[in-house]
Amino acid sequence: MKTIEIRRHSIRSKPGDHLNQQGITLARLVGENLGPFDRVITSTLPRAFETAIAMGFAVDEQIELMSTYGNDIEREAPWPLSCAGYAEVVRKGGAAARYADQLVAIYTKLANYLSDGRAALVINHGGVAEMGAVSCLPNADHFAWGSHFEPCEGIRLFWEDGKFVIGEILRVSI
């Protein structure tokens, strides 16, 4: 089985693009219990790659698609929604569903890159993380997943026999 861990970036002071000290501290604490990862991918925004680095992992690739999803998708899926809310929006089709399909393609390519028993880390953003997660596991009980992902929270996706088979929600207690 292969594992892809998708997490939202750590804490920043809005409207800034960079992590604040609290965000660096949180990412360091979370990172102490993570890994190892064969591949680390983030969005192109500083707070995403800073989170990976603060967690203790070098970034192998940055992907623009994971940086933002634009106004059309924001209208369909305004931040923040619960995981079930994002799943409902994606099921309706439209721009959010097309975007989520692109995320699934990235995660599928990443899973195919990994050897069996290995793992990868993805750091992106609120809304992006949830839409990708619900689309990787469209038949999961998204209500049980709870609310949107707070900083450094996310999901651990398990890949087996050419598909995502289960997800473990990753919550952080501060």
Language model features with spans:
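Active-site-proximal alpha-helix that buttresses catalytic centers in soluble enzyme cores
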Residues: M1-Q62, E88-A96, F149-G154, W159
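A generic local structural motif
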Residues: T25-V30, I106-L110, H142-F143
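Short, solvent-exposed loop/turn segments at secondary-structure junctions
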Residues: S10-S13, P46-R47, G126-A129, C136, ...
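Flexible, charged surface loops at secondary-structure boundaries
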Residues: E32-P36, N112-G117
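Phosphate-handling substructures
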Residues: S13-P15, A54-K109
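Beta-strand elements within well-structured catalytic alpha/beta cores of enzymes
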Residues: K2-R8, I41, Y113-V128
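Short amphipathic alpha-helical segments
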Residues: A52-A54, A133-C136
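Acidic, low-complexity terminal tails and accessory targeting/binding regions
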Residues: L65-P78, D116-R118, V134-I174
